[in-house]
Amino acid sequence: MAKLPEKGQTLWGFTVTERNSISMLGAETAELFHPFSGARLLYIHNDDRELGFNLIYRTPQLDNLDSNHILEHLMLCSCPSYPSRDVFFDMDSKSYSTFMNGITDNTCTCYPVCSLSMEQLIKLMDVFLCCMEEPEALKDHRFFMREGLRFELEDTDGELSMLGTVLSEDWGHLTDLEENADSAAAQALYEGQIAANLLGRAHFHYKEITFEKIRQTYEQLYDYSNCLMILYGDADLEAVLRFLDEKHLSRFKSRNLNLRPLFEGPVSSGFRKTEVKSPAYEGSPAEHSSVIDYTIDLSGLSQEDVICMGFCAGMMDQDTSPVQRAARSLGLNNIIDVYLDTALARPVLKFRLQNGDKEQQELFFQAVNQGLADMAENGIADELYHAVIKENRLADLLMRETPHLGFHLSEDIGRFWSLTGRTDYYSLYERTFTHFSADQEQSILRRLAKQVLNPPSAVLSAAIPVPGLAEALEQERDRWLREKKASMSPKELQALIRETEDFKKWSAQDKSCLDFLIQPEQLPEPEEDPPFFSGLRHGIFCCGSPSPLAGIGSYQLFFDLSELSGEDWNYLTLYQMLLTELDTRRFCVEQQKIMEQEYLYDCTFDELYPDADAGENSRPMMSVVWSGLTEDFEISLDFLLELMRNGNYEYRETISQVIEKYLPDYDLSKSENGPSLAYSLAERYIRQDSRFRFQLNSPEIYHFLKNILTILIREQSHPDDEAARTDANQISSSLYTLAQKLVSRRKLIFLAAAENASLEHILDRASTLLSQLPERNENGFMFSNHLSLPSWDQAPSLRTAACIDSSLEELRMLGDFKKVPEFKGRFLPWLLAAGDKYVKPAVRYQGRAYDSGIDFLLPAGYFTLWSTEDPDIESTLSVFNRTGQALAELKLTPEDLQGYILSAYAQALPPIGILNSRMRAMRRYIMGISTVYINEMIRNIRNSTVNDQKEASDLICRLLKSGPVSVVGNEKIILEYKNRFDEILKIKEKNGTV
């Protein structure tokens, strides 16, 4: 790595103002100031090959119209240097970028891009900067009509409609309970201040949105003197500085914008209470569904104390903290989240009670204050304090495993800078963490607990879902549109009809820009798998891969599920839910909660059923993944096995409390589950593994858990009822039996990635401990290979819809090329061309979806046509069905294809961390996934030529003709097109199907 310039040194119009370091990233930093333009640049320099650049503007929410969000969409549409219909999507679909986005926050707007190529990064930076300087969208009203808001009228007798990408996105959040809760708290806490305005509220203020207001927002906010640029990775700093100065910054004299005072000013003191009605659709639950927040303003704290409050919040969020204990002692069996929220214009400490009722507000408030008083007086248990400190340290050590790290870091720094004017967030974080973790007396924690126990300003708020209110707001919108049309003169109506026609013609134009391309010959070779070894140790199949990272490792276990039968499968969800919730033979619940934090970092359970390519591993399995310090490995594995084997399932009152607490999380009818459910419904048709996972996590699990809860409550309510006790005993017995069947050494697999000095010891201790597990259960029943999952032999429907509590739809159509040998890597760029040139224009620009496109998953062997937050089913599915034919008709130049080659290569070869790459290689080996085949496909991407068009279109036609379709969303829209589907699931109804 090249040496950074020293403080005071001047390069290309920039002067180095600060030098620092971030040890967790292995990075040195330099902050540079460009006096002429007023711009600042922070360079975070380490050996990361994935480079990142982020252009960040300080953007206070000056109103409730979501103006900054609309402006963010407009900024990267077009500019004189890069004229296009939408140059952002040109770059996204035709460049070697590994990440790209535009993101609006409550205090800043950022435009990040990442790439593995320095040349590509600078070319994309040029597009971003040119668009910021001369956005074409602020001159041509039609961009605003597309991205923000427009009115359409086909003829004088037709209905007036209101459309727009951001409006559609915001309207899709109509029933977002937590978003509505955040808004209610901010409005009450910061009434009359900018901090009260949150993003994403256009659907409540659409009558006030105008193009002129958006243009005014640009003039108020966008200047280089109100901008921070962040460069990350092993970049060529001098080349970047020269480019910035010569091509951009030297052309724009600073306007000396100073918007930070807009975030400042006194906060009204005192305690307030408020309630807000949150829209919900008819049939949505009203009981046990509210969000109750206690929000404390932290404006008076120093930056160091705000960071420390984040550590304290992490401790209070734990199940064994004084706040959580106080809540349980007062009879509150709800999930209570505690977190520091720095995404607002002012930092706040948030206590959030989930799945509550408004009558719980006072009890919740009492619990929080009781817990805070305990902490202020006594601190927290030393074991919990040190476990949370260790968990934070592990997170810091593993930060480099995060893909697109340059973006994630810069987002945090951007928020910090927008409020403070400082860029040293991570350096300050490290110093503060060192100070906090060394505070053995917990004096900082006790002091902060005392401060928030009697805060200068706080609000207790409740967001209460009101079924039917969503429909009422939609009806109000439709009534307003009818009245608006009725108020228009014949001349105005004709003008709107012409404007609608003109907009549709303009939107249908294929105008793109390719002036940012690099040559495909410059693309790197795909990397081979990192080395690993495998074999039997003490009868356990083990794989190990040496890592250069000292002191930290990643681990994975695969338990065989072949013996499970009948209701075992439903109980698997309950079994996983109860881990760390019941005493075991060696550890009480409180000990488990603390040890989980300390020894099982990011521990996740999952189910899988690899296909025939996995050979003898083509069988149902349960995976357990975790990370930790290598010195703690043996303790972590021993603890994990104790959790899994020895839960006391006689504690049925506790089991009922746990189910009651977490049951709402299994309700798939919530709108936020739409995207994942849409993928699951489609994937289950083409993949055994996906079908297996869907059946184990289907909507019916929610009803199974409700039934278990009913049985347990009946036993508690009728202790003398023998039948009730028998039914409840059966639940305990089923859980014991399941644990015996699950935790066996039969066909057990263990993977480890760790430093070479520790790896042999880890594999030896793992195989020794695991070999002591039984191979048959305690009843002596031999395990078998038979799979008896209910409905397993019933083929999934080809075309499935699911009705959930949502205003819009998620649509997916899949093409399966895994077993199609004639499908080569060179066809992948053509897939992306079809998405960019046909699907996105038809569904997003000319349709009404928030976004749409085509993606592929190379290791999984399929591609997806998708649209999100889409009010149209019929037209979108028609577009999807015609994709192959449309591709055959596209007119692509070699330069167009070059861009799609770059994008396909970036999508096929995403960056991956050191530990993750080793774990992935071993997992692929276990699953029978060939890295050689994947790399051959990736290399073949570069061989794509215009001569491949017909073969690609024919293959895509064929694959889509037999591919599955799923639609998840609004029931009314789905039922309008019910003939399109073989099966319609009504998630909120127990019977499940209509």
Task: Enumerate the language-model features and the residues they cover.
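Non-catalytic terminal extensions that flank enzyme cores
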Residues: A2-G52
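Non-catalytic accessory/assembly modules
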Residues: S78-P80, E133-E136, D140-L167, W171-L174, ...
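Acidic/histidine-enriched segments that form metal/cofactor-coordinating
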Residues: C79-P80, V87-T217, I307-G310, D317, ...
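His/Glu-based metal-binding/catalytic segments typifying zinc-dependent metallopeptidases
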Residues: I44-I56, L167-W171, L257-P322, G406-R422, ...
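Catalytic or ion-translocation cores adjacent to nucleophile or general acid/base/metal-coordination motifs
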Residues: P80-S84, K94-Y96, S254-G265, Q556-F558, ...
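A structural supersecondary motif
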Residues: S95-F99, D293-T295, M315-N355, Q597-P610, ...
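C-terminal regions of mature proteins
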Residues: A2-P5, I230-G233, V388-R537, F541-P546, ...
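Active-site His/Glu-centered metal-binding helix of metallohydrolases
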Residues: L71-M75, Y575
